Amino acid sequence: MSRLFTLVLIVLAMNVMMAIISDPVVEAVGCEECPMHCKGKNAKPTCDDGVCNCNV
């Protein structure tokens, strides 16, 4: 029973880590893709040090 509980805890911890790692908010978009990336957000695309910023 304790092995099953340990396995369930490991699987849950891995799911939480994957959710944090694959967070789309941390997505880095280059300057070339910046206008398309900001297009649907009604924002003005600017590029600072090679990183896209969508300024509302």
Swiss-Prot record:
Main subcellular localisation: secreted
Signal peptide coordinates: 1-28
Compartments, as annotated in UniProt: Secreted
Disulfide bridge map: 31-47, 34-52, 38-54
Family listed: Belongs to the short scorpion toxin superfamily. Potassium channel inhibitor family. Alpha-KTx 09 subfamily.
Free-text comment on this protein's domains from its UniProt entry: Has the structural arrangement of an alpha-helix connected to a beta-sheet by disulfide bonds (CSalpha/beta).
Protein name as catalogued: Potassium channel toxin alpha-KTx 9.1
